[in-house]
Regions:
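Active-site and donor-binding regions of nucleotide-sugar-utilizing enzymes
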Residues: 3-176
Length: 177
């Protein structure tokens, strides 16, 4: 049986992940899921190791006040993912959390494939991140067509799937037509 760990860090990521996972579940019944998610993934019957609300902070002061809690959650999340030993870690948005976790998972178990949905806006700011992302991401799913050229140039394997709010037409292979 294949295993996928779904990693989200905020409600919008939970919503997007649930849309992708619901499509996968209609095509494949031989996949075991585990997550850090919220209500949308739970509605699909996917167990979560903790609710993403435990790591969702908006204000900078909230992040500072909870810095050590967040670091502990990152460590605990990595350990739970490694214990689950998925074939794929599917991380969604929230790059400051999900990509930190993904990097640590890849360092500890390079066999786990890491697919990230919603590219960080490295083409707009903090461009140096893309070089680090190439070290641990196996594939990235893109919202905007112009991102494809950028990530192709950076030699990061990618697929343009489109923006869920702009276009709901995604085929069974998660490629926008």
């Amino acid at each position: 049986m294949k295993k996928i760990f779904v990693l989200t860090g905020e409600p919008s990521g939970d919503k997007l992940a649930s849309e992708v996972i619901s499509q996968i579940k209609t095509k494949r019944t031989d996949i075991e899921f585990l997550s850090v998610g919220g209500a949308n993934l739970e509605k699909l019957g996917i167990k979560t190791i903790y609710d993403q609300k435990e790591i969702t902070y908006i204000a900078f002061t909230d992040i500072l006040l909870n810095f050590f809690k967040i670091k502990r959650k990152i460590k605990d999340t990595v350990n739970e993912i490694l214990k689950f030993n998925p074939d794929i870690l599917f991380s969604v948005d929230s790059p400051d959390f999900t990509l930190r976790v993904a990097k640590l998972v890849k360092e500890k178990n390079p066999k786990i494939k890491i697919i990230h949905f919603i590219a960080p806006k490295v083409w707009a700011w903090r461009e140096g991140r893309v070089k680090k992302m190439k070290e641990f991401l196996d594939h990235i799913l893109l919202l905007f067509k112009f991102e494809k050229e950028y990530f192709d140039k950076e030699k990061l394997t990618n697929t343009f799937v489109g923006h869920p709010l702009l276009d709901k037409k995604i085929n069974k292979n998660f490629v926008r037509k």
